[in-house]
């Protein structure tokens, strides 16, 4: 992996497993588009409480040459799947990949 990756945990305990998963997702993005300049990811748990459990929100900022940053905010809304941090990460990076594909076209 050559792209610098900044990972921030907000209201979430640091997890090596989460960092590994994010870095794996970044490698997949690099395989598609090798000109990424940097990636910033914020994993957070909003302070509001839900009846069934806490959900996670993942924000990703991809810095690309010659264009505005690609920003993805995956707010869980009513999606209870985002009670699993790894599902929230997967969904956020899937959205980032789609936006990156649009940028390349």
Q: Could you describe each region identified by the protein language model?
A:
Residues 1-105:
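N-terminal, polar/charged subdomain of small-to-medium soluble alpha/beta proteins
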